[in-house]
Amino acid sequence: MSKIVKVIGREIIDSRGNPTVEAEVHLEGGFVGMAAAPSGASTGSREALELRDGDKSRFLGKGVTKAVGAVNGPIAQAILGKDAKDQAGIDKIMIDLDGTENKSNFGANAILAVSLANAKAAAAAKGMPLYEHIAELNGTPGKYSMPVPMMNIINGGEHADNNVDIQEFMIQPVGAKTVKEAIRMGSEVFHHLAKVLKGKGMNTAVGDEGGYAPNLGSNAEALAVIAEAVKAAGYELGKDITLAMDCAASEFYKDGKYVLAGEGNKAFTSEEFTHFLEELTKQYPIVSIEDGLDESDWDGFAYQTKVLGDKIQLVGDDLFVTNTKILKEGIEKGIANSILIKFNQIGSLTETLAAIKMAKDAGYTAVISHRSGETEDATIADLAVGTAAGQIKTGSMSRSDRVAKYNQLIRIEEALGEKAPYNGRKEIKGQA
């Protein structure tokens, strides 16, 4: 019943109007799984390769017909007749056939779309929701939790055309009792933030991830307007709602220094920038900082972990790129204490589950994440629940590509009830 009988790849459009790969995996008995690969803007240099055509006459060179061709050709031929329930086996066939370290032959976008579509098809054949199938693949059947959202309500950096250096300013509704309540709290703060910004004569256009992208005078001002919005929404900052930031520091790392336009083009050393962040954590209840230094600045990260690692969650995104080899090295060297998990940085479900397991076994937290280029595919919601990861980062309270994931979490919570607790603050490293 779970034998693969047909594989289809197609070029679809993502939330930025760029092409991406969608795949369908059809099984005996009429079961079908469909999934699409996301795409990042600020990318780590060691991510698996997203294969683009480079033909400037189509989609400004961003077409994915080569990756789609790989799905419809060699990948389909290799997995036809195989058992979709053997996820690790299917992923291994594709990875081995690609034959490169970074999946540059077929493209991580091709392999990932098929990998996720295969998991969905297998779940359908087993007559179970995707999160339940993922929990079984993860070796943790029946163990679920609802993730605490990191809601990106002010966008800067590569995600917005403004003078804010830090890429994301997020809220985490840690005081909620359920994910549904957390989403309501996030929505209320989001709407109050619009009022605060309008009251200051600021722009309320949104960035790639649905957060506002106002022209603020400094990075600290972004935190100040969020604090104002939290209060206006009737919540207590630090108790009901905590703050998180994604610096994406590689984007403003120039010649060994961190150059911040929002701080008057001041250049910081690794140590100075760490203390700049430390000062912000003293002024505001920031409990999580992602990519607080450049991905190659491991000495700086060791220092940052020493200074801040006992107090707050330090998340590695560009730093670790969902790669177990790099994460293992980071764990051994005491770098950061959390990993951001992005399917397409590594390119298959099996490797993604391995990264989550390695992180958890080492006492690191794992934050499941979207990319800035997304589709209506909500697989990351099921991944977060099925691995009991504890945290999810999937944008703001606008744009249907972001909201699709929140709505899926609401549905899953309704189905699981008390079997999937929302643990709030306890999920965040250093906050239990």
Curated annotation (Swiss-Prot):
Its main location: cytoplasm. GO terms for molecular function: magnesium ion binding; phosphopyruvate hydratase activity. It is found in: Cytoplasm; Secreted; Cell surface. GO terms for biological process: glycolytic process. Its cofactor is Mg(2+). (2R)-2-phosphoglycerate binds at Q167, K342, R371, S372, K393. HAMAP family: Enolase. Catalyzes the reversible conversion of 2-phosphoglycerate (2-PG) into phosphoenolpyruvate (PEP). It is essential for the degradation of carbohydrates via glycolysis. 'Moonlights' as a plasminogen receptor. Binds host (human) plasminogen; only protein purified from the cell surface binds plasminogen, soluble enolase does not. This is Enolase.
